[in-house]
Every structure is written in structure tokens, then in C-alpha cells.
Amino acid sequence: MSVRVAASAGFCFGVDRAVGLVEQTVREGKRAVTLGPIIHNHHVVQHFAALGVREIASPEEVPGGSAVIIRSHGVSRAVYEALQARGLEIIDATCPFVSRIHRIVQEAEANGRQPLIIGTPEHPEVVAIAGWCRHPLVFPDGEALQKWLDDDPKRHDLPFTMVSQTTSTQFLWDSCKKIAKKVCTSLEFFDTICKATENRQAEAAALAAQCDAMIVVGDRKSSNTGRLAHICAAHCPQVFLVDNASELDLPKLRQAGTIGITAGASTPAWIIKEVNHTMSEINTTVDAAAEESFEELLGQGIKTLNTGDKVLGTVTAIGNTEIQ
């Protein structure tokens, strides 16, 4: 068995930055809360809760005298303004690539254009992006976009600005662009899929195509982790989505010759290392068992011959002192 770990597995820039801001806040001794989970990984959220940085759900829940840390997915303009109205210290951990999308949709509406957002409507990042628009339109896939455009041909001539959730797949984004290009007369695109996400997905697909089994490590609430599992499933017969090493299906994994490991953008390094370590231990066990099995077979194939014994075989050579 061989185990290969994707080079891109683990924290992306935005997640690393957000986690770093919380860690800095803790080091400075500030009282703080996060507005929603700082990232989509419950292990990280629990870690910070143990350090005194708990999660809240709304601006009204922020205790007096506490700083509020905005999650990496961002928040809507209304939420941001509600925090400012209370005079709270705001530590903005929004991913810079997500903040860029907020600016794009604001400028689009200021110029009389209609933002089209491609992404999962209920995902926190998409909810936040939509919250920076007066009249947001969100489409989860090309089918929904196609139906909306077909329902009223007059929509074809509206000025549209299209953006994507940063963790969307390139396939989804390309298919939506293709649909819009066919009928829309005033259309502009901003390729807002995070490059780290794009590279991670491409690497996962390439690795999955070379493996008998793929392990995708991450929180099940993580959108990019779920998409990685979906991408891997298109290239590999067995895909295991696990939260941590304790969820590994070891009996099935022992049957695989080559195993690949990748992880979502919000998966901590220590969890990836734990999974890799567990698989490496299995690999050592498998190799030892294979060696023992070979020795047993070799022993079974060696038989001591005595004078007078009869054997069945093929003679390949005859010498003065031996027969082969």
C-alpha cells in the first residue's frame, strides 16, 4: 500500500488569516466573540471556545465591552452596520477574496447593473454577498439560471454582472457563463472562484485518478470539503469523507493499493497529520503482514529431499554431479 497526501491539503490563505486574527486577539487578552463560526470546522471552533472566544449568532448577543470578530465568510451590510451602531470594536476576519466580491456587487448596482450570484443560496458566504446588494439574484446551478432567463425574454437585455461563490467548482461557473452568454446582451463576468480552491480541486481530481481510494478530510458543514469529495468521486471508485482519523474505515482502506489524502480549506494541519499517521501505521502493518505471508509461502515451497524419494518435475540439465 502507498499513501499520498495532496500538497494543497489544509488551510487556505483566508482561513489561515481568520484563525490568526483570533489567535492574536487571545494573545492580547481581549474579551471577544465570533459572529458565527470563525471557519467551518467544529474542532477549531471548540478550541477557541476553550480559550474564551465563544460563538454568537447575532449582533444583539455581543456582550458589552467585547470585541466582535467577523467570520471568514463575511456578513451582510445590515449586520455590519448594526455592529457599528452599537459602537463595538470590530475585528474583520472576512476573507479578502470574499470582501472583493462585496465591492464588485456594490459597484455593479451603483452603475445600474444587476448582480447575478452563482452559489449555494443558504451558504454563509453567499448570504453575506447577497446582503451587500439591494436586489440580489442567487442561482445554485445552471438549470436554475436557465429557467429564470427563459421565464421572461425581456430579462435577456438587462445589464448583468455575474460573480461566483469563492468555493464553487470551475465546471459550475463555466456552465453558468455559457448559459448567460447565449442570451444576455449586456453581460460582464468576474471570475471570483478562489485560485487556491481551483488548484485544490484540480490537484484532488488528478490524485484521485491515480488512486484506488481517496480520503477527503474536513467538517461536513464545509462547502469546499463537500465539493472535493464530489470531484474525487468522479475519478476514484472509493471516496471516504471523514471528520478526523477516528472515522476512517480501516477494513476497507486496507484493501486499497494506493490511497490519496486531501482536505478542505478549513481543515487544521494536525487533523490531516493524524489521518496520514494512521494510514502510515496501517501501511507498515500491511507491509509486515505481506512479508510474513511471503516467508510462509516460501517455507511451504521448500521441501527436504532424501535418498529414495520420488518427485515429479522437468529435467532442464544433467551434469556429472547433479540433475536440474
Kindly give the residue locations of the regions a language model identified:
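The feature marks the mature, well-folded catalytic cores of soluble enzymes
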Residues: 1-282
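Single-stranded RNA-binding regions, centering on S1/OB-family and related RNA-binding modules
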Residues: 281-324
